[in-house]
A protein has these predicted regions:
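Leucine-rich repeat
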Residues: 3-7, 23-28, 44-50, 66-71, ...
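Conserved LRR concave beta-strand detector
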Residues: 8-11, 19, 29-32, 40, ...
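Leucine-rich solenoid repeat scaffolds
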Residues: 68-137
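Solvent-exposed loop segments of extracellular immunoglobulin-like
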Residues: 150-167
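Surface-exposed, flexible coil segments in extracellular/virion-facing regions
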Residues: 167-186
Length: 299
């Protein structure tokens, strides 16, 4: 649509459009082009735009920075990973629908100053936060970008993270199956019956709730470092302060091996007494006795 400087309205819904040029439409106030195949669109000439509907396209990002008069704005069912919001922070004032995209807690738009209530922002569900399909125990999983957000709240909110088994939904145990600090996770290498995923919940975006609308990661398979068996001997191992690991009911000539979570061998010990005590630097380890193992956190 070129050389139409007096054009006010465009209705182009449900076509096969892969491109739409509105850079020469400075007076455009109404653009309805939902249900097309647009991968990008330049709206930087459309500062008078009031009504925008680009839902059900293939957009991965959109720049609304000059669209400070927006009322209703519909961008659902795209591939959006980034939205540059109107620069004055007031618009859209009527509705903003961004559900069914690839936005995260950290990239979702906040409730604007012009919205009369949080219900005018529709954001759930979103596509899962993508993680690698396989992660080795000891590898850091960094979700700290999602830890803090304002969203529709009047204050900054903190995200709650819950790791669950894929099929059963059973929650994993913090400081047993994984350690966490400020949204950064390390899996300890405990035996897990299934792949896992992380559910992220926050009062910043309270509609991320329930099976259909929860915000979660993709499924991840946690692998144990090579040379460490899947069996467990946790009932025979205790830890105390000062970096001590104690192995109970050990049999003579059993080989005890202590690994870091990334699979590096820390120390070995051949059992000579019923109880063996091993000194290590406080931290998380995998202890292997014969062909059995368990993870421990040593204070």
């Amino acid at each position: 649509v070129t050389n139409n400087e007096e054009l006010y309205y465009i209705y182009a819904e449900e076509n096969e459009l892969s491109a739409l040029d509105v850079t020469h439409c400075p007076k455009l106030i109404w653009l309805s082009a939902n249900g097309n195949k647009l991968e990008s669109i330049d709206l930087t000439a459309c500062s008078d735009l009031y009504n925008l509907n680009l839902s059900e396209n293939l957009l991965s990002s959109i720049d609304l920075s000059v669209c400070n008069d927006l009322g209703p704005c519909r961008l659902s069912n795209n591939n959006l990973e980034e939205i540059i919001m109107p620069s004055e922070g007031v618009a859209p004032t009527t509705t903003l629908d961004v559900k069914n995209n690839k936005l995260t807690i950290s990239t979702l738009p906040e409730k604007t100053l012009g919205m009369s209530s949080a219900s005018r922002l529709t954001y759930a569900p979103q596509a899962p936060y993508v993680l690698p399909k396989d992660i080795t125990a000891g590898t850091v999983v960094d979700l700290s970008s999602e830890l803090k957000a304002f969203g529709v709240s009047d204050k900054e909110e903190t995200t709650t993270y819950t790791w669950r088994l894929k099929t059963s939904g059973t929650a994993l145990q913090k400081d047993v199956d994984y350690t966490e600090k400020d949204g950064v996770f390390t899996f300890t290498g405990t035996e897990l019956a299934d792949s896992v995923y992380c559910v992220m919940a926050t009062a910043a975006y309270p509609k991320f709730t329930g099976t259909a609308n929860m915000f979660k990661t993709t499924n991840v398979h946690i692998t144990v470092p090579a040379g460490v068996d899947e069996n467990t001997v946790s009932s025979r191992i205790i830890t105390t302060g000062n970096g001590l690991i104690k192995v109970l009911n050990a049999e003579n000539n059993d080989m005890i091996e202590v690994f870091s979570l990334n699979g590096a061998l820390v120390t070995t010990r051949k059992v000579s007494e019923n109880m063996e005590t091993i000194k290590v630097v406080p931290g998380s380890y995998i202890v292997k006795i014969g062909n059995k193992r368990c993870s421990v956190i040593v204070p």
